[in-house]
């Protein structure tokens, strides 16, 4: 019996002590404002301090935070902001709507230097297989003569091969030039055209995007070692294959040039739609190429000085 009275006495003392603590806390924290997500607490020294709210009331009034997360109510949002030390605001009332965002992981189709060099190697291998040595009573065909034959076959009469003519020449041997860097056949066909442009750029002395026979000969000369080009951006140089992101787009360093996707942030491919985002992307691409041009000029000057 006495144990029951003792337990009751202890409970009464605890309640009285709790009420006194609560009155003391209310008195100490009376003029303290802690802000959203925080509450006033009393330290061991009896001084007020602001701490993250320990537990919010369970009333249900969902809100969507600026971080895209749904909270049960305003209190839970501000409490989370306090606990994580981040700035979270109420975006709108209700559950957050699912956002269809475009991941910048979608990269543009590009011809890397490895793709370009592999295509070039296959073309040379195919042409070398057509070499016919001179016989006792017959004249064969050397490498230059074979190139001359193909050059004349695909030249439209202006003594130059442009990219479309070069591509037709390349497609003469479908097996040899069938580069499959992408699972999509359409992308692989696009890749081939891009690599043809990269090959033309290798020996296009006057930058007219056409090859004379001498330029064509240099491009496919087995002893010619294609140079490795890097991309420049903000006083830094990046190796082939390097990537950078801008908004919802990804830019890739390809054969010395930055190549960017052209996507709006709602996930739609831009095809002639003049939007503010597209203009920004155009300026960004121009800026990348400007840095690239400056870097190449600097490189030439340094080479001359050496």
UniProtKB/Swiss-Prot annotation:
The modification Phosphoserine is found at residue 163. Residues 142-176, 191-226 form the EF-hand domain. The keyword NAD does not apply. GO terms for biological process: cell differentiation; endothelial cell differentiation; endothelial cell migration; hematopoietic stem cell homeostasis; negative regulation of apoptotic process; regulation of BMP signaling pathway. Its main location: secreted. Residues 1-18 form the signal peptide. Residues 231-285 form the VWFC domain. Coiled coil: none annotated. Glycans are attached at residues 142, 173, 178. One of its GO terms (molecular function) is calcium ion binding. Keywords: Disulfide bond, Glycoprotein, Heparin-binding, Phosphoprotein, Repeat, Secreted, Signal. It is found in: Secreted. Disulfide bonds join 29-40, 34-50, 52-82, 56-75, 64-96. One of its GO terms (cellular component) is extracellular region. Residues 46-98 form the Kazal-like domain. The keyword Cell inner membrane does not apply. Residues 28-51 form the Follistatin-like domain. Transmembrane segments: none annotated. Secreted glycoprotein that is involved in various physiological processes, such as angiogenesis, regulation of the immune response, cell proliferation and differentiation. Plays a role in the development of the central nervous system, skeletal system, lungs, and ureter. Promotes endothelial cell survival, migration and differentiation into network structures in an AKT-dependent manner. Also promotes survival of cardiac myocytes. Initiates various signaling cascades by activating different receptors on the cell surface such as DIP2A, TLR4 or BMP receptors. Homodimer. Interacts with SCN10A. Interacts with DIP2A; DIP2A may act as a cell surface receptor for FSTL1. Interacts with BMP4. Interacts with CD14; this interaction promotes TL4-mediated signaling cascade. This is Follistatin-related protein 1. It comes from Rattus norvegicus.
